Every structure is written in structure tokens, then in C-alpha cells.
A protein has these predicted regions:
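N-terminal carbohydrate-binding accessory modules
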Residues: 20-62, 94
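Polysaccharide-binding and catalytic clefts of secreted carbohydrate-active enzymes
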Residues: 125-284
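Aromatic- and carboxylate-lined catalytic core of secreted/periplasmic carbohydrate-active enzymes
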Residues: 335-461, 470-473, 477
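C-terminal beta-sandwich/jelly-roll accessory domains of carbohydrate-active enzymes
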Residues: 420-429, 444-550
């Protein structure tokens, strides 16, 4: 088997060096994942797989993220069982779904809990990472060649099996390598093998990538000796480990590859969160160390969704969110990332365990996004012509102004308008969000929920005075409670320039080729007599807005 791996490595080097090789951008451009990730144990039997896959189709997913378990794939060393993989692929095809397999190999959420028992028991051959005090961890050491070879043999057989079953069909659309790699209890591994590597020289390519001038330095000389320096050291070696697996995958069955990261949130220091994984502040290290991996992807569970997403929308790193807290706001968050970043996809975690109120919102959002695919997918010719944006609001983040040439799109949460009693009665605001696409001059699609959008020229906006509105839609006297832009004030000023007006607002559906199908017209009270386009909270619509100037 070792000779086989060596042959694969040689072929991989030749394959990866060819100039015809696809870039990460090209390879991931076909992805438009309206996904959901199964809970960790939801695919451990064929009965579970048979039960869960029909439910995923009913939620309007187009892709299911499914674990591939090393311990169940190779329960006895050298003997492989792919029955769970085969059943997943079969059920996906039956329900017209794509699959992203998650390789739960040497590490899952930092730990080596999905390694087979024969691997776990033989700590002499497959050593553990250690803290600085010498405490062994339930984490296989990334510095052990034996650990890598065992993981790689199983991963290689897994990829070979996928190629045999799926090449030319394409049910499997992407592979996640390991799961939330990272060190815990210490910022780096202090095992004997790790200490030997730490005393060595920093690779020249990493020093160059990080803007370090001096070559031939040790890790301590180049980066210092604190926990942040330890994290850089560990990140490099995790990345190099993953790169070797990625090269095997690329050679055996070429498809998009990514690694996911648990966020370093809540003020924790390295060692207190899963350190050295593909985190945003380590993106340079990971991109240098694992160039064959197409995407570094965030698992977002904490507050500040927009901020976390922005950190991973980097040049050469298409945004994909493989895990996010499944909640009633998941739907508008999906609309936001697909509109703002033309993301590769969005996938709430434990979708099989979600409550109906949570999956209902996600299903409605995915129904809109599936229709918007001709306008949002990076592989669509329309992406070469039209711009798109995403908006996402809550009770504290209520407005965004988008500049599109001389036109401003003044976007706000729907509850900034006062006539819905939920806006002012103390009810917590649901998040509102949308994907907005410009399909022609002065012509837009808005797909979302809980948003209101005004359209004004820049000169008009500069001369506008905010007028607080009452629940009847007219100017409110006294202290402002909510506002909508208006031209004019109590003082007389001469207006200059042109104004933007709404020609019409239509509710539409969209066919697979991008053709708009008229459903109904929103006018009068539904667009505030031509002042804005809006979609109510917990309503889900696609609006086609045509503007004019006067």
C-alpha cells in the first residue's frame, strides 16, 4: 500500500504541475449550494440515511453535507466498508440531491474521536499530541508520519471508491478534509516529534508569504515564543498535512476541496479555542501551506454573522459557510451571503434535528434562491453582466445605503416603518435580509424577507430631509419614531437635479432560464404610493422593480 501511495503522490505532482489545471476560482464556480449539514451521528446506519434524505429534499435543499466516518469505513485495519457511502449516494440520486462528504478522519472538532479503535489503542505507533506539561491529548499528532499514512490510506481508498461510483455522474460535488482542525489545551503540540520540528528552520515560502525578510530562522527567531507564535507554527504543520491529503484527492477524483474552521470567538486565547485551524487570521499560513485546498470556510455560530462572513470573503477564497446555527434567521442569512458575496453556498448544521419553524424559513429562502440562481450563480452568463448585493438587518443594525452609480438604494429593516405593531410593541425583531440583483439600467430584483428599499439619485438624497412617519404613513408631529426620506423641509430651498421614481413593483417567480413570470403588482399601500419596495417580516418574495427618472 505504501508503494501505491508513493505512485499516487508522483502522479499527483505531475497532475498538479500542469498548466491546464483549474484554478480554485474556476473549480468552485459551479457551486451553488443550498445546503444543510446532518448532525454528526445521523448517517451511521443505512436506516438513518434512508429516513433522513427524503426530509432534506422536502426542505428544498439541493445539497446535503454528510459525514464519512473513518472508524466505520475501516473498522479493521486494511479492511474497508463503504456501505454507508454507497447508501448516501443512492438516496441522494433518488431525491435529486447533491452530496458534500465530510472526511471525519484523524481529526473532528480537534479530537481524534473518529479514528478507528485499532488506531486509538496503538499510541506507540500513532502518537498523541501533548501539552507543554507532557499531558497526552485525544488528538493524534500531526507530526507523526505513521498517523498521516494511516489517515491517508483510508482517505485514498475513500476517494478511489467515490471515483468508481460517481465519476461522470457528479452526485458528489465537494469534499471537506477533516473537520474543524485545531489544538486544544495548548496552542501547539509539544510531543517529541513536534519539539524536533519546532527547533528546525521556518520554510522559506512561509517567511516570504508573511513578509519576513530574514531566511534561515527558527520558529522562535522568526515569530517569537508566545502563544500566537506557537499557533503559527502549528497552523503551518496542520496545513502541510492537509495539503498532502488534498493532493491525493485531486489526483484520484478531481473536485472542489475545502477545510472548515471553528471560530476564535469570545476573547479566547490560542489553546482556549481550536487553535491553528484555517482561521481568518491564519489565512496566509494556510493558503501558503495548503495551496491545493480551494476554500477556507467558517463555521459561524456566534453573534456577528456579517463580520465573520466578511473575514472569509477574500481574494482567492470564495466564501462557503458549511456550518451555521440553524434558527429562524437562517433563511435571510442565506440570502445575504448569496447576494453580497455570490457565495459557493450556505448550510445550517444539524438540519435533521431542526424545528419546523426553523426549517420553514430556510425552505422559503431556498425556494427564492433556487429561482435566483440564473442571476446569482458564478457559472451563469448573467453573472458577467449584473451586479448583486446582500442586505441583512436586525434590531441594532437597521440600514444600509448601496451606491449604484448615481443611484442610491436606501435599504432598511421593514420594522423601521411604524405601521406594523410588532415594530414598536417590544416584540424582538426577526432578522430581515435579501439578495438584490441589478438586471438592467434602473431595474432590480429583490429576493428576501423583512426589508424595505427606497431608490434615490445622489443629488436627490443630498437634498432630502428625513420625515418621521406615523402608523398611518403620513408625517408624524413631535419626536421622530421612524423615518422615510423625503425632499423638502420647512425652509424653502430650490431643488436641483433629477429624481428617481418607481415605475412599478411586481411580485414575480423566475424560470430556470431567468425568465420573469408575473404574479401580481404591488401598488398603492403595498409600495407606499410609489415611495419604496418592501417585503414584510416573515413574508418571502421576489420583487421586480422598474425605475424611471423625472
Amino acid at each position: 500500500m505504501r508503494k501505491t501511495l508513493s505512485a499516487i503522490a508522483l502522479l499527483g505532482a505531475l497532475f498538479l504541475s500542469t498548466a491546464a489545471r483549474l484554478s480554485a476560482q474556476d473549480r468552485t464556480s459551479q457551486l451553488y449550494i443550498l445546503g444543510g449539514e446532518l448532525s454528526n451521528s445521523a448517517a451511521t446506519s443505512t436506516a438513518d440515511i434512508d429516513e433522513v434524505m427524503p426530509r432534506m429534499k422536502a426542505i428544498r435543499l439541493n445539497t446535503v453535507l454528510v459525514p464519512a466516518y473513518w472508524d466505520l469505513t475501516e473498522p479493521t485495519e486494511g479492511r474497508f466498508d463503504f456501505s454507508l457511502i454507497d447508501r448516501t449516494i443512492f438516496q441522494a440520486r433518488q431525491h435529486h440531491l447533491k452530496v458534500v462528504f465530510l472526511w471525519f478522519g484523524a481529526w473532528k472538532n480537534s479530537m481524534s474521536c473518529y479514528a478507528p479503535l485499532w488506531f486509538k489503542e496503538n499510541t506507540k505507533k500513532y502518537p498523541r499530541a501533548m501539552t507543554r506539561t507532557g499531558k497526552p491529548l485525544e488528538i493524534a499528532s500531526a507530526f507523526s508520519e505513521e498517523v498521516f499514512q494511516a489517515d491517508c490510506r483510508a482517505f485514498t481508498r475513500f476517494m478511489q471508491h467515490l471515483a468508481e461510483k460517481d465519476k461522470g455522474i457528479g452526485t458528489v460535488s465537494m469534499i471537506q478534509i477533516e473537520n474543524e482542525i485545531g489544538m486544544l489545551e495548548d496552542a501547539r503540540d509539544h510531543s517529541p516529534l513536534a519539539e524536533k520540528a519546532y527547533r528546525g528552520k521556518v520554510p522559506a515560502e512561509l517567511l516570504k508569504a508573511m513578509g519576513k525578510q530574514a531566511a534561515g530562522q527558527t520558529w522562535a527567531e522568526a515569530f517569537g515564543t508566545d502563544e500566537h507564535a506557537d499557533e503559527i507554527f502549528m497552523a503551518w504543520h496542520y496545513a502541510r498535512y492537509v495539503e498532502r491529503l488534498a493532493r491525493v484527492a485531486r489526483t484520484v477524483y478531481d473536485m472542489p476541496l475545502y477545510v472548515n474552521a471553528a471560530m476564535n470567538s469570545r476573547g479566547r486565547k490560542p489553546g482556549e479555542y481550536p487553535s491553528a485551524g484555517p482561521l481568518a487570521h491564519l489565512a496566509t499560513v494556510w493558503k501558503c501551506g495548503a495551496p491545493t485546498v480551494d476554500m477556507l470556510s467558517p463555521d459561524i455560530y456566534d453573534t456577528g454573522f456579517k463580520s465573520w462572513a466578511a473575514q472569509y470573503a477574500l481574494p482567492g477564497n470564495r466564501l462557503f459557510i458549511p456550518e451555521s446555527r440553524c434558527c429562524e434567521d437562517s433563511g435571510v442569512r442565506a440570502l445575504y451571503v448569496m447576494g453580497e458575496y455570490q457565495a459557493a453556498g450556505f448550510s445550517p448544521f444539524a438540519i435533521d434535528q431542526a424545528q419546523p419553524t426553523e426549517t420553514r424559513a430556510l425552505s422559503r429562502a431556498y425556494h427564492l434562491l433556487s429561482q435566483m440562481q440564473p442571476y446569482l450563480s458564478k457559472s451563469s452568463p448573467r453573472r458577467k453582466t449584473y451586479n448583486s448585493w446582500g442586505i441583512l438587518f436586525d434590531q441594532n443594525d437597521r440600514q444600509r445605503i448601496i451606491a449604484d452609480g448615481d443611484l442610491l438604494l436606501i435599504c432598511r429593516h421593514n420594522f423601521t416603518l411604524p405601521w406594523d405593531k410588532r415594530a414598536t410593541d417590544g416584540t424582538p425583531w426577526p432578522e430581515g435580509g435579501a439578495a438584490i440583483v441589478k438586471i438592467a439600467p434602473r431595474e432590480y430584483l429583490i429576493a428576501g424577507s423583512g426589508v424595505v428599499v427606497e431608490f434615490k439619485t445622489k443629488t436627490e438624497h443630498l437634498q432630502a430631509q428625513p420625515h418621521p412617519l406615523g402608523e398611518d404613513g403620513f408625517t408624524l408631529g413631535g419626536k421622530p419614531a421612524a423615518t422615510e426620506s423625503a425632499v423638502g423641509s420647512h425652509k424653502a430651498h430650490s431643488f436641483t437635479g433629477r429624481r428617481s421614481g418607481i415605475g412599478y413593483v411586481d411580485q414575480v417567480s423566475i424560470l430556470a432560464d431567468g425568465t420573469l413570470q408575473y404574479l401580481r403588482r404591488d401598488n398603492g399601500d403595498q409600495d407606499h404610493q410609489g415611495r419604496h419596495a418592501r417585503i414584510g417580516a416573515r413574508d418571502w418574495r421576489i420583487l421586480h422593480v422598474k425605475l424611471y427618472e423625472y
